[in-house]
């Protein structure tokens, strides 16, 4: 009886592992492995009409530097030679 229970568990685990390893996640516009086709990316850039450059507003970049300021203090405390 122990051997049959063990066999059933092994078959179930094998089936689950096979399903996970053989299945692929597909999203609209994305290729397997998380790669996008170049044509779709170019179309997206043209639709945005930015020429491929996205500029951040000045307020956002200032806010980011303010958020990173405590890390600068920590780095100077622990690595004063830099």
Swiss-Prot record:
Q: Which PROSITE patterns match?
A: GNRH
Please give the InterPro entries that the UniProt record associates with this protein.
GnRH (IPR002012), Gonadoliberin (IPR019792)
Signal peptide range: 1-23
**Molecular function via GO:** gonadotropin hormone-releasing hormone activity; gonadotropin-releasing hormone receptor binding
Domain of life of the source = Eukaryota
**Similarity field:** Belongs to the GnRH family.
Output this protein's name. Progonadoliberin-3
Q: Which organism is it from?
A: Oncorhynchus nerka
């Amino acid at each position: 009886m122990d051997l049959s229970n063990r066999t059933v568990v092994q078959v179930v685990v094998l089936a689950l592992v096979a399903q996970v390893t053989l299945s692929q996640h597909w999203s609209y516009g994305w290729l397997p492995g998380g790669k996008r086709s170049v044509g779709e990316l170019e179309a997206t850039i043209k639709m945005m009409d930015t020429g491929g450059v996205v500029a951040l507003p000045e307020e956002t970049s200032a806010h980011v530097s303010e958020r990173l300021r405590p890390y600068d203090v920590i780095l100077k405390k622990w690595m004063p030679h830099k």
